[in-house]
Amino acid sequence: MKKVLIAGGNGVIGRLLAEGLISDYEVTVLDKDHFDGKASSIQADAANYEELLKKIPKDTDAILNLLAVKIKYDIMDIAEFEKMTDVFYRASYYLCRAAAELGIQKLVFASSNHVTDVYEKDGRSLLGREITTSDYPLSKNLYGVLKLTSEQIGHLFYLENKLSVINLRIGTVVTDEMDTLHEKERTKKTLLSHPDLLSIFKAAIETNIRYGTYYAVSDNPGRPWSIESAVNELGFSPQINTAELLNEEENGA
């Protein structure tokens, strides 16, 4: 059974993955705070390299970088910039470097659709077609810029250290999908459902592709991003989309 380390496992995505992957993998969660789920828990600050290097198990097969921090979208806030760069720049580099130094073969990075959010409004592509990873990355906020920076850090480690890196530009993942679908129209197009979240991360862990960037969104009607490469290259198999979720609710399933 492969050993998977989830860095930043106390967030929404981390908890969903820790619970969903544990039947197929030996899962360990690394976070500043103790993880109280079924997976093993390691407390460490990912922005402290020496601490990270000591605490990551050397026999880890894959690291999932889900590190996150609450953010404000204020380009003029220096304190906010420094907080974000600690997580989305410094810690991203540290995780890649630790993986390379410890001989860990794979890192899956939870990137964001905000890397290209200039091309999307209210869940609709402004390009007249689905947005692809070939489109030049342009973001409306520092969060998207730093997520792209982390993707590029991973690419450098792939080139220089042969670290396998898969970047997943994630759509919308929430704990309560139905409430959010009723409250936010955009989510009907941008949701990555819980089954599809597990499906694409499993595909990223298991793929033989050494490096790639993919959009991670369910096969929702009118979705703004293309999942063609994720399906064809990673073997991503979407299980349920927003139309099906809403239909199940309507029919009382």
From Swiss-Prot:
Gene3D superfamilies: NAD(P)-binding Rossmann-like Domain
GO molecular function, one term: dTDP-glucose 4,6-dehydratase activity
Source taxon at top rank: Bacteria
Family: Belongs to the NAD(P)-dependent epimerase/dehydratase family.
Protein name per the record: Uncharacterized protein YtbQ
Native source species: Bacillus subtilis (strain 168)
